[in-house]
Amino acid sequence: MVDGTVDGRSYRCLLDTGTGRTHIVADDFISEFAPLRQIASSGVFAPSNDVLIQLPDVTVGALSRRPCEVVRLDVGQPGARNLLGMDLMKTHRCDFLFDDGRLVIDSPGQLETSHDLHLDDADHPYVGVRFPELTAQAVWDTGAGITIVDRGFLATHPDSFHEFGSSTGTDATGAQVETPTFVVSEMTIGGVRFSPHRVAAVDLAPANATLARPMDLILGFTTLVQANWHFDFSRQAVGVTRGFDR
């Protein structure tokens, strides 16, 4: 979670690289702003229609946007919470230091070792995930609690996954679905090998149908916490250094 301001008023947000646009839950102040338009969006489990409003500014530390179009969420919407999206991060270097619980913005110097990073039209960051037989495409999503693997991908590469119970997941629309879970046995990102950990299997075909670049995985906290991540979003480069296992 990060603390920020909207027109000088304090708001706490979940930092969410999996959403292209910042979301703010309506309160008395936010409700004063007239809707600009509605846009269609999609979570992992369900589609939704979002209301856009324009705020004077949104600021979180060195991240700031003036003015800033955000999605306004109804306070009664299931799972509604403030989300700091890629609209504030996409022009910055962001170092996600999970072993120290810190986010560093615009640190000086170049990445010592970098790999290609792709941002799609909605500014979702994609990284390559190396399995023994191929490289998969994954969205790097700090808003996801558990890593998600597409069921179709899992079915064609079963040797890398071992069944392990089930879990109830919630997507950005608030929809909840119970999903089977697996342990991923071996994968490498940015030259760093990740220890076996739990992932959830979800049919990503509906979400992928709306994307120019389909995703095989959505990397969530269970994966991200094992490393430190150094993103230069403006140069579309990422470096990965070994953190600690959890």
Region locations from a protein language model:
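Pepsin/retropepsin-fold aspartyl endopeptidases
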Residues: 1-246
